């Protein structure tokens, strides 16, 4: 493998055996591609804004004299960039401008004569834009739109599995689900009649729909039944015979023809009888007259002579009717063929319960069901039915729906109209009846072929269409009002409804979520999340077990492991690593094609529906050099079942062993050795890890760390290759390689880094360069590490030396004993940044004022404020300190005589304002790292605001001029090259000032042209610089657009350093979580023979019952990795020659049976080997991919190479006594995470505080400054102890005895510790409730 200069700094040893056929795809593509589809111009008009416009426009006036046509649209440039939007608290969006054409037709002239055309560009609101990382900035906060897994449009056949009716009879139903429009359900009832429901309303007999479609009874029977024809000849009744229909029947008379008896009366008819009848070509048999009684007539029979109806279609025949028919000359009678086995009489029975008999009555019936209480008219009934399923505006199956619909009904074509046709409805009914008759199967709703993904773009498009439809109504009204000659398109379009619909979706939809920004992994997982909840989806309460379960079709599409615990389990899932959506929105996963028994590298993406037709081998099947399967029988999946197949039956093979799991689960090493429940917790807890002060790459990883870190967008990645020309903490400058430059550009890339910014979860986002001056970089190399990344690899926690042993009960019940060294080295110290805002409003009594002149506040409290009343940057503040001084005017109060006297003596005290300053919340302390002041336009800026403004201007100017210098230097070096090549001497040039270079003339025509081009570029550069500076200056100095009534906002940012302490929650990656019980002095920790103490002691009893053995293997492998690092460290300390180092490191990389990774250190220069060794000192990082990881033998070999015992256990000594523990202990390195459940955020104590309004009991929870609940179980405990007085105190004065508690407070203040319990308020509430039932209870005093 070829490594770039940056990648050679640290190479992770990979234990994977299976070749990597397909690289991990870009992990955010599901979000970015979907939104791109929404925004980009689509000439076909299939997707996005274009599709929405085309579906609503052209809008015609009611009279048809004018119409508004859509021409095209364009998105403008956003006003602020992403960072500015976050600081200012506005939405990152672009204005949408639409070109519309108003066409007015002549009234009197023939159809289509145009009188006037006006075209105009109209503003239609703002469209929020997606950032490069797949998020949206809405009102200054980053949000993610989660994709939704919903039921695909189409037709579904299902059954109630016998649960509806008490008899346990299975009732079948069919449901046509459109993309938008009314649902149409067909269902059987226990009596086998077929009913229809529209939009889940009252059910009607299904034949009503057919009658409404203008079918007569005769035509309906014709559609659904085969005929049995009887003929009357010579007073004998004969029946046309179709032998196949007799199968399984019992003959009720002798079946004979041509004098030969084929079946005797009472015998069952078998296949042999049928063969004989067919062989002899028997067409007619004689039947007894009684046989026809009870048969159902298939059409109307009319007496020709009188014109009266003898019997109507769907009537049962009797012998009387037969005689009448015979008399009136009907010798050929058609009846319906039904039997109990596979031709039920369902439609015929349904027609009997159908109250309607023609189209109009059917339409009226449907109208009454949809609009109860309204008087039906013919027009209303017709238009209602027409609009339900047959109007393009109200009903749309969508391309997906039509495809699924036609596939389900086994039709050839998969495209078609978006509305229903007569045939569609009849075919659905036919298939439902077939299923009831035992032919065909019902669908599986949880199959991923029946559920599809709706992503951002699609949902935004739907919302946008909703807004457009609202506008459409207004435009129609406007077009009908006349005065069209003066009307322009922009007078008709009101952008409010459109932007309101879009804003509502991005701001408050259930699927628009506040981004989880704990660490890069939680960001990436949030964007790849798939929810079954949300509008048009399921609800938590209604979802049963089946929907939440892992389905065979999830394989490679949805992760079976990563889902939340709790009420949402199984409803919120995560996309698998390689999964993507196809054009219809179904999830598909890649497979390698197998051709003639050879596994090729050709990749096919298969959806769940297609996958069912193939036999697919597992990724870990063994192959030989040519790509044949080694074993004769291969474990494969087919139709959702796993079993053995012979190797020539295999069609496809999995791409990778990690294709089953999601990104989160693919980061757990030795996942294959963990129980699934614990793996779920492990995957979920990695997302809660807080970024530590110094990121530390995991010694034992899975090889996915780099992909996650780079794709999450928290690192700075080189867009083009080049050389590092300048680097400091806040910017990196790359001089681009010649071959990657665009013609006519300076060839300089500048990367500005993010410094100490607050994330959504109050963690700290900070980027640090990881390249040095003069280093070569290639495209895609990581230039700067972000939070939780280390040299471009995800690093969520720290590698800790752990021992599995009990230690004095301090690791009882998953507690964790931690060494003080961990605190000293700041291993788990994290920085949290809090934003505190102070808003100055305009009140009725006058404006609030931000000032340092606050009434009744001592000097000490103001010591940290400047003269504007705003805290200094760098000030250390604690709970209760003032950050921003603010006073609010208050109304005049009545003064007491004493106050009046004091006023008169001491002059006017500022009595008309009250202190409403912003103070630091209790329990928070930290350093002020930034202050921002936003002032409304037209309000005078205070001194501090002007200072901040000046500083920002200075910084912007400095940044831009530095940028200009860098670009100029690049340009002049090229000018110099041209001049020297054109014959100007280098010494002469260096004496001239640079500006004069461009005035020199060259004899060579071509070189002179180049020089002129460069001179143009130089002018353009300077012009561009001026323009940028002016734009920046305008943005900084202009007033801010604040909410109505707000004059000023001051935001202060506090950085809080949190060290690890008892009560903090920690976890490994295998679901092994615990709480720190004690921080132990280093000298008391167990130590080994070299005197190295362990950092963390874990309870060995936490492993066996939880079955997450992965943590033990990780510990052993971590030990081996560290051992090799220690050996390299020793060699570096002894300053051994490079050859020895190279040889040892090469041995480590080559270790392991047939691993895929080949590292050839002979291609590395000595300097590169030394730098690699330097980076391996702390341990050699190892990758053990999921389901393809290191084997036990390989771990032992690695331990041996590091001169460590192969058992993985060593002798430990007690730090307090120095005695050896009685048996060897498992010691190694485990990657531990500090989770965002910090004791500082949870600790809370109440003395007195707020009470609930009705019950008068203290509130609960830290946010309300609430008390601790003393629940019924606690009451039982005190009762059991007989602690009556304690219990009385708990239930009265400490809770809701209002008078008692105020007296108690007074008593304690007076130093008298007696209580007088009274009546708890809850008892009064109970009395009131009983009285509300009409029972009067009164309390009597004794």
Curated annotation (Swiss-Prot):
GO terms for biological process: DNA-templated transcription. Its EC number is 2.7.7.6. Transmembrane segments: none annotated. The keyword Ubl conjugation does not apply. Keywords: Acetylation, DNA-directed RNA polymerase, Nucleotidyltransferase, Transcription, Transferase. Pfam families: RNA_pol_Rpb2_1 (PF04563), RNA_pol_Rpb2_2 (PF04561), RNA_pol_Rpb2_3 (PF04565), RNA_pol_Rpb2_45 (PF10385), RNA_pol_Rpb2_6 (PF00562), RNA_pol_Rpb2_7 (PF04560). SUPFAM superfamilies: beta and beta-prime subunits of DNA dependent RNA-polymerase. It catalyses: RNA(n) + a ribonucleoside 5'-triphosphate = RNA(n+1) + diphosphate. The modification N6-acetyllysine is found at residues 1022, 1200. It comes from the Bacteria. One of its GO terms (molecular function) is DNA binding. GO terms for cellular component: DNA-directed RNA polymerase complex. It is an enzyme of class 2 (transferase). DNA-dependent RNA polymerase catalyzes the transcription of DNA into RNA using the four ribonucleoside triphosphates as substrates. Belongs to the RNA polymerase beta chain family. The RNAP catalytic core consists of 2 alpha, 1 beta, 1 beta' and 1 omega subunit. When a sigma factor is associated with the core the holoenzyme is formed, which can initiate transcription. This is DNA-directed RNA polymerase subunit beta.
């Amino acid at each position: 493998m070829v490594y770039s200069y940056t990648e050679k700094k640290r190479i992770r040893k990979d234990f994977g055996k299976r070749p990597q056929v397909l690289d991990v795809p870009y992990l955010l593509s599901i979000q970015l591609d979907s939104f791109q589809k929404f925004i980009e111009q689509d000439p076909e008009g299939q997707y996005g804004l274009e599709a929405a416009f085309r579906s609503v426009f052209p809008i015609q006036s009611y009279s048809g004299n004018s119409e508004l046509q859509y021409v095209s649209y364009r998105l403008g440039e956003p006003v602020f960039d992403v960072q500015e939007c976050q600081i200012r608290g506005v939405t990152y969006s672009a204005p949408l401008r639409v070109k519309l054409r108003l066409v007015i037709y002549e009234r009197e002239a023939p159809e289509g004569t145009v009188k006037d055309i006006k075209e105009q560009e109209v503003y239609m609101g703002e469209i929020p834009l997606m950032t490069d990382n797949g998020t949206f900035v809405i009102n200054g906060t980053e949000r993610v739109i989660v994709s939704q897994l919903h039921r695909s449009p189409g037709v579904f056949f299902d059954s109630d599995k016998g649960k509806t009716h008490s008899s346990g009879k299975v009732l079948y139903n069919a449901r046509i689900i459109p993309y938008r429009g009314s649902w149409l359900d067909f269902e059987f009832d226990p009596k086998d009649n077929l009913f229809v429901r529209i939009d889940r309303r009252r059910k009607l007999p299904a034949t009503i729909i057919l009658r409404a479609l203008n079918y007569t009874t005769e035509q309906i029977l014709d559609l659904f039944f085969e005929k049995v024809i009887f003929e009357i000849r010579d007073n004998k009744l004969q029946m046309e015979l179709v032998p196949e229909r007799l199968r399984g029947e019992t003959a009720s008379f002798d079946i004979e023809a041509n004098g030969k008896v084929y079946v005797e009366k009472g015998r069952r008819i078998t296949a042999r009888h049928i063969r004989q009848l067919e062989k002899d070509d028997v067409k007619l048999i004689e039947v007894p007259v009684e046989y026809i009684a009870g048969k159902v007539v298939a059409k109307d029979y009319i007496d020709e002579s009188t014109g009266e109806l003898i019997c109507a279609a769907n009537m049962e025949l009797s012998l009387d009717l037969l005689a009448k028919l015979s008399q009136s000359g009907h010798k050929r009678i058609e009846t319906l063929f039904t039997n109990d086995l596979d031709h039920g009489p369902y439609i015929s029975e349904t027609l009997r319960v159908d109250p309607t008999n023609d189209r109009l009555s059917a339409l009226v019936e449907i109208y009454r069901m949809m609009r109860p209480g309204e008087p039906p008219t013919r027009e209303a009934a017709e238009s209602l039915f027409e609009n339900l399923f047959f109007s393009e505006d109200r009903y749309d199956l969508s391309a997906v729906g039509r495809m699924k619909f036609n596939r389900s009904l086994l039709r050839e074509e998969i495209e078609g109209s978006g509305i229903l046709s007569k045939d569609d409805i009849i075919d659905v009914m036919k298939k439902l009846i077939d299923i009831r008759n035992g032919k065909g199967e019902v669908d599986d709703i949880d199959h991923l072929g029946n559920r599809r993904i709706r992503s951002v773009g699609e949902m935004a498009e739907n919302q946008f269409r909703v807004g457009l439809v609202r506008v459409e109504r207004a435009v129609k009204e406007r077009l009908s009002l006349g005065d069209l000659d003066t009307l322009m398109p922009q007078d008709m379009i009101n952008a409010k409804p459109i932007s309101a619909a879009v804003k509502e979706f991005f701001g408050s939809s259930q699927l628009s979520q506040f981004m989880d920004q704990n660490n890069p992994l939680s960001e990436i997982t949030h964007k790849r999340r798939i929810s079954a909840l949300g509008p048009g989806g399921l609800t938590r309460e209604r979802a049963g077990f089946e929907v939440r379960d892992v389905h065979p079709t999830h394989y490679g599409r949805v992760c079976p492991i990563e889902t939340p615990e709790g009420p949402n389990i199984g409803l919120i899932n995560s996309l698998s690593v390689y999964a993507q959506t196809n054009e219809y929105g179904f999830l598909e996963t890649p497979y390698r094609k197998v051709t003639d028994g050879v596994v090729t590298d050709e990749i096919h993406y298969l959806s769940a529906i297609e996958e069912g037709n193939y036999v697919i081998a597992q990724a870990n099947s063994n192959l030989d050099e040519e790509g044949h399967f080694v074993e004769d029988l291969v474990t494969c999946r087919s139709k959702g079942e796993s079993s053995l197949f012979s190797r020539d039956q295999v069609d496809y093979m999995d791409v990778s062993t990690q294709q089953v799991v999601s990104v989160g689960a693919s980061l757990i090493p030795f996942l294959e050795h963990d129980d699934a429940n614990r793996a779920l917790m492990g995957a979920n807890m990695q997302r809660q890890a807080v970024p530590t002060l110094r990121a530390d790459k995991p010694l034992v990883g899975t090889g996915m760390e780099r992909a996650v870190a780079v794709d999450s967008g928290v690192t700075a990645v080189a867009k083009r290759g080049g050389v590092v020309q300048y680097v400091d903490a806040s910017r990196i400058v790359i001089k681009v390689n010649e071959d990657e430059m665009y013609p006519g550009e300076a060839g300089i890339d500048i990367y500005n880094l993010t410094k100490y910014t607050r994330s959504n979860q109050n963690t700290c986002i900070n980027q640090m360069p990881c390249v040095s001056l003069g280093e070569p970089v290639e495209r895609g190399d990581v230039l700067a590490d972000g939070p939780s990344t280390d040299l471009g690899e995800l690093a969520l926690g720290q590698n800790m030396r752990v021992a599995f042993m009990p230690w004095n009960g301090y690791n009882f019940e998953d507690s964790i004993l931690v060494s003080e060294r961990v605190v000293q080295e700041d291993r788990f110290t994290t920085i949290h940044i809090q934003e505190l805002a102070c808003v100055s409003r305009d009140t009725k009594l006058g404006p609030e004022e931000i000032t340092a002149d606050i009434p009744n506040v001592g000097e000490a409290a103001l010591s940290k404020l400047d003269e504007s009343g705003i805290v200094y940057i760098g000030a250390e503040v604690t709970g209760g300190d003032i950050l921003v001084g603010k006073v609010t005017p208050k109304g005049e109060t009545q003064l007491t005589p004493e106050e009046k006297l004091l006023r008169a003596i001491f002059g006017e005290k500022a009595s008309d304002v009250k202190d409403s300053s912003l103070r630091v919340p209790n329990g928070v302390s930290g350093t002020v790292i930034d202050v921002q002041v936003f002032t409304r336009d037209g309000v005078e800026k205070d001194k501090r605001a002007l200072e901040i403004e000046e500083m920002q201007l200075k910084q912007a100017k400095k940044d831009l001029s530095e940028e200009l210098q860098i670009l100029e230097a690049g340009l002049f070096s090229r000018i110099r090259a041209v001049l020297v090549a054109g014959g100007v001497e280098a010494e002469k040039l260096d004496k001239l000032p640079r500006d004069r270079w461009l005035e020199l003339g060259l004899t060579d025509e071509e070189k002179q042209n180049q020089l002129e081009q460069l001179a143009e570029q130089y002018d353009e550069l300077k012009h561009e610089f001026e323009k940028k500076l002016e734009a920046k200056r305008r943005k900084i100095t202009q007033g801010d657009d604040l909410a109505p009534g707000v004059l000023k906002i001051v935001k202060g940012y506090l950085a809080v350093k949190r060290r690890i302490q008892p009560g903090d929650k920690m976890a490994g990656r295998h679901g092994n979580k615990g709480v720190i019980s004690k921080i132990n002095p280093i000298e008391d920790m167990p130590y080994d023979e070299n005197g190295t103490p362990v950092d963390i002691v874990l309870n060995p009893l936490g492993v066996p019952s939880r079955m997450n053995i992965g943590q033990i293997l990780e510990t052993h492998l971590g030990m081996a990795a560290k051992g090799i690092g220690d050996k390299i460290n020793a060699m570096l300390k002894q300053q051994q020659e490079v050859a020895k180092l190279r040889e040892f490191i090469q041995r480590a990389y080559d270790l392991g049976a047939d691993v895929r990774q080949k590292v050839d250190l002979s291609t590395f220069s000595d300097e590169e080997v030394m730098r690699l060794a330097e980076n391996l000192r702390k341990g050699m990082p190892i990758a053990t991919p999921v389901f393809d990881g290191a084997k036990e033998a390989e771990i032992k070999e690695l331990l041996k190479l590091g001169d460590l015992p192969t058992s993985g256990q060593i002798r430990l000594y007690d730090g307090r006594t120095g005695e050896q523990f009685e048996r060897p202990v498992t010691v190694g390195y485990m990657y531990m995470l500090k989770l965002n459940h910090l004791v500082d955020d949870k600790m809370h104590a109440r003395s007195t505080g707020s009470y609930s309004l009705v019950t008068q009991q203290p509130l609960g929870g830290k946010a309300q400054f609430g008390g601790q609940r003393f629940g019924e179980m606690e009451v039982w405990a005190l009762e059991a102890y007989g602690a009556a007085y304690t219990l009385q105190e708990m239930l009265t004065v400490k809770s809701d005895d209002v008078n008692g508690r105020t007296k108690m407070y007074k008593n304690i203040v007076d130093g008298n510790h007696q209580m007088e319990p009274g009546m708890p308020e809850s008892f009064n509430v109970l009395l009131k409730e009983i009285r509300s039932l009409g029972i009067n209870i009164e309390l009597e005093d004794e």
